[in-house]
């Protein structure tokens, strides 16, 4: 179904894609016949919900800031260079399943966050709308899972049981929604960081840095890790 106002050029920018042009566009993508002129027009419709939690982000620095609306708040800067503005009106949430039962971060507010902590958030009007703490770096807590199963988009805190000779495949142990210990083999080919408790620093890392006994945060989709953080 084509929205009635798709031809409103004040609301939508219409671009022409040449047949010889290679380009990557966000889904979904709706194509429309440009008519007798023969050119193919494309309207890009980005329907990603702002209500969906982000991939977990590692905090690099917290500071007071003023946004473009002259609102005083908190600028949360993340490892990797991204940042987000947090005002006074934030809905604090907790992960599901046994996560909140095995570690309690319910009293942690944005002003309590610090270097190394890991959060997820949603935005509205370029500000944090909802926020949940995934890991406090000084209180990592026991192994646990967020979600009914890790096959869905979710997080787990797991222990590394063994690492294959190829340095990329690891067997990890976590606790499922029923409290039972589970073992899973995972190919670690995602963005990876290592938090070093000896100096409090966060380093770019890789699967080859995994060691037996490491405790790790794994954010994955259908067992395919998107982010791994090694705590050592």
Task: Please provide the spans of the model-predicted regions.
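...the same signal can extend to comparable exposed beta-sheet modules
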Residues: 1-232
């Amino acid at each position: 179904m084509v929205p009635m106002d798709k031809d409103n050029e004040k609301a939508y920018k219409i671009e022409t894609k040449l047949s010889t042009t290679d380009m990557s566009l966000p889904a979904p993508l709706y194509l429309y016949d440009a008519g007798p002129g023969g050119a193919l027009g494309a309207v890009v419709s980005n329907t990603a919900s702002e209500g969906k939690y982000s991939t977990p982000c590692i905090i690099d620095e917290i500071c007071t800031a003023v946004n473009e609306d002259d609102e005083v708040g908190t600028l949360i800067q993340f490892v990797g260079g991204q940042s987000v503005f947090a005002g006074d009106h934030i809905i604090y949430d907790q992960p599901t399943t046994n996560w909140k039962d095995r570690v309690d971060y319910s009293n942690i507010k944005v002003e309590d966050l610090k270097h190394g902590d890991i959060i997820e958030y949603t935005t509205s009007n370029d500000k944090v709308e909802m926020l949940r703490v995934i890991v406090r770096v000084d209180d990592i807590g026991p192994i646990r899972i967020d979600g009914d199963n890790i096959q869905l988009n979710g997080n787990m805190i797991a222990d590394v049981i063994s690492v294959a000779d190829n340095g990329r495949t690891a067997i990890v142990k976590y606790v499922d929604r029923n409290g039972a210990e589970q073992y899973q083999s995972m190919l670690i080919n995602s963005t990876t960081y290592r938090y070093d408790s000896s100096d409090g620093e966060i380093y770019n890392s890789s699967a080859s840095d995994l060691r037996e006994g490491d405790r790790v945060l794994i954010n994955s989709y259908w067992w395919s890790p998107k982010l791994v953080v090694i705590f050592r």
